[in-house]
A protein has these predicted regions:
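Conserved ABC transporter NBD signature motif
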Residues: 85-93
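Conserved ABC ATPase "signature" C-loop
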Residues: 242-243
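A short, proline-enriched helix->beta-strand linker immediately N-terminal to the Walker B motif
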Residues: 182-186
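Conserved ABC ATPase signature
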Residues: 163-167, 171
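The conserved cystathionine-beta-synthase
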Residues: 290-319, 323-327, 333-346
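Helix-to-loop junction immediately C-terminal to a conserved catalytic motif
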Residues: 77
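Conserved ABC ATPase "signature" region
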Residues: 25-35, 92-93, 134-137, 141-158
Length: 346
């Protein structure tokens, strides 16, 4: 387990059926999901999955319907019991926790936000937000203060005394987000939270969550079937197919180097210039003019800057710009109009 790892999953399996453990013990691991189902009558929903999530990052699990993404994420809190494997949070194995410790994890350290909001229709917005604090036994005044603070954080000032039926879908999802944040969890799990929303509201909620994450710096695990949403939201993305992870990487790594045709199919319609960075696209061999600019500390571009932010600066000039490592400041290459235009047309 690395120092900054918050969640580490190792060799997670989930088999659905009456004899799941026996079936897994005797399973030919080379069989496909359909072959296992045909031979045993059991369904392999998650197959030997391993990944880690760093503290404070947004880790996206992306896949089509039936890929196993929701089952996998429910294994993190044992809403679904893994058939085999380890789930460690802060080096504690969740699969070995007592019921008491598991309740503490779900109540105090982890919150979930679902596609269907799950709000109590008979409770006002402020009461819905404070529900998690209520079951913790937090005093009413403290509960109200924290709920109002979180209400304001998600942009619902003035809606505290309304009922869920009086709110739009996007506003109801904000209440669900506020309820999850109010208990100040270490980990937030989102199961396709925006997929039922209209496209415009969905984009607004994505932007809102990104903004909130910059402030609260929680560890987030976000499930989606939408690759565009995955690359927008995720620091790292795990792409699933048939219960297995096809590829894990940053959005840039996946767009630039898809490991197979399945992953490549997702990336083909993505505007690559919005994902790729100057460091990824830079020409490694620099001309003398570029080296001179670097020596002068003039007009250097950091390696982590996205290409789309450079278009206005570079598109109308023949000038070559030094690209420097965002951490060390060392010269790593150069970038010019031809590179920017290539990234826009590839």
């Amino acid at each position: 387990m690395e120092k900054n790892d918050k969640i580490v999953c190792t060799n997670i399996w989930k088999v659905f059926g009456p004899n799941e453990k026996n079936v897994l013990t005797n399973l030919d691991k080379n069989l496909s999901r359909s072959e296992v189902q045909e031979k045993t009558g059991h369904v392999v929903a998650v197959k030997d999955v391993s990944f880690s999530v760093q503290k404070g990052e947004t880790f996206v699990v992306m896949g089509l319907s039936g890929s196993g993404k929701s089952t996998l994420v429910r294994c993190l809190s044992r809403l679904i019991e893994p058939t085999a494997g380890e789930v460690k949070i802060d080096n504690q194995d969740v699969t070995q926790m007592s019921n008491k410790d598991l309740t503490d994890l779900r109540r105090n350290r982890m919150s979930m936000v679902f596609q269907h909001f799950g709000l109590f229709p008979h409770r006002r917005v402020i009461e819905n937000i404070g529900y998690g604090l209520e079951i913790r036994g937090v005093k009413k005044k403290d509960r109200l203060d924290k709920s109002m603070e979180t209400l304001n954080l998600v942009g619902l000032e003035g809606w505290d005394q309304h009922y869920p039926r009086e709110l739009s879908g996007g506003m109801q999802q904000r209440v669900g987000l506020a309820r999850a944040l109010a208990v100040d969890p270490e980990i937030l799990i989102f199961d396709e939270p925006f997929s039922a929303l209209d496209p415009l509201i969905r984009r607004e909620m994505q932007d809102e969550l990104i903004s909130i994450q910059k402030m609260v710096q929680k560890t987030m695990v976000f499930i989606t079937h939408d690759f565009s949403e995955a690359i927008k939201m995720g620091d790292h993305i795990a792409i699933m197919k048939d219960g297995e992870i096809s590829q894990v990487g940053t959005p840039e790594e996946i767009v630039a180097n898809p490991v197979d045709q399945y992953v490549k199919d997702f990336t083909e319609d993505v505007p690559k210039y919005k994902v790729l960075s100057a460091g990824k696209c830079a020409r490694k061999e620099c001309c003398e003019d570029t080296r001179t600019l670097f020596a002068q500390g003039s007009e250097c571009i950091k390696s982590d800057v996205k290409i789309d932010t450079l278009i206005n600066q570079i598109a109308d000039t023949d000038k070559k710009y030094p690209v420097i490592d965002a951490v060390s400041g060392e010269l790593i290459g150069e970038i010019d109009r031809s590179i920017v235009l290539k990234s826009m047309t590839s």
